[in-house]
Amino acid sequence: MTTEKKTMNISEIQELLPHRYPFLLIDRVIDFQEAKYLHAIKNVSVNEPQFTGHFPQLPVFPGVLILEAMAQATGLLAFKSFGAPTENELYYFASVDGAKFRKPVVPGDQMVIEVEFLKERRGIAAFSGVAKVDGEVVCSAELKCARREF
C-alpha cells in the first residue's frame, strides 16, 4: 500500500482561491485527503505589508491572518473534496469559535496549517484547525465556512 502525499503548488492553489497578493496566505499544500484533512504551508517574510504597522519595532504576524490562512486552507479542502467553485461562487469565512493564540509568529517562521473536515449541513462546513511553527501549536480554532453564489 502506498502512502504517497497529495500536494498542490501555488498555480494549483490560485486556480481554486480568488485571493491574490497580499492576501493569498497559502504558499503550498503539502498533503491532503478529500473530505478528511489538508496540510499547507505559509512562509512568513519580513517583506509582507502588515509588518510596517504590526509592529515596526517587533514584527508579529497578526492573529486574524493566521485564522484567515486556516480559512483559505478549508476552502482548498472543500473545493478538492466537493468540486471547484463556479464563476459566480465564493467560499465565505462564516464563523470562528474557541480561537487560542499560544505563541507569536514572527518573520522567518514557517507555519504549517492543518485543517480537518468535521461535518457539513445546509451548505455550511465545519472544520477544526491548528497552525504550527517548528512542530509547536501557535493557534487553534474551530471554523465554519459557507459556499454561496453571488
Curated annotation (Swiss-Prot):
Its EC number is 4.2.1.59. Its main location: cytoplasm. GO terms for cellular component: cytoplasm; membrane. It catalyses: a (3R)-hydroxyacyl-[ACP] = a (2E)-enoyl-[ACP] + H2O. InterPro entries: FabA_FabZ (IPR013114), FabZ (IPR010084), HotDog_dom_sf (IPR029069). GO terms for biological process: fatty acid biosynthetic process; lipid A biosynthetic process. Keywords: Cytoplasm, Lipid A biosynthesis, Lipid biosynthesis, Lipid metabolism, Lyase. CDD domains: FabZ. The active site is at residue 54. It is found in: Cytoplasm. One of its GO terms (molecular function) is (3R)-hydroxyacyl-[acyl-carrier-protein] dehydratase activity. Pfam families: FabA. Involved in unsaturated fatty acids biosynthesis. Catalyzes the dehydration of short chain beta-hydroxyacyl-ACPs and long chain saturated and unsaturated beta-hydroxyacyl-ACPs. Belongs to the thioester dehydratase family. FabZ subfamily. This is 3-hydroxyacyl-[acyl-carrier-protein] dehydratase FabZ.
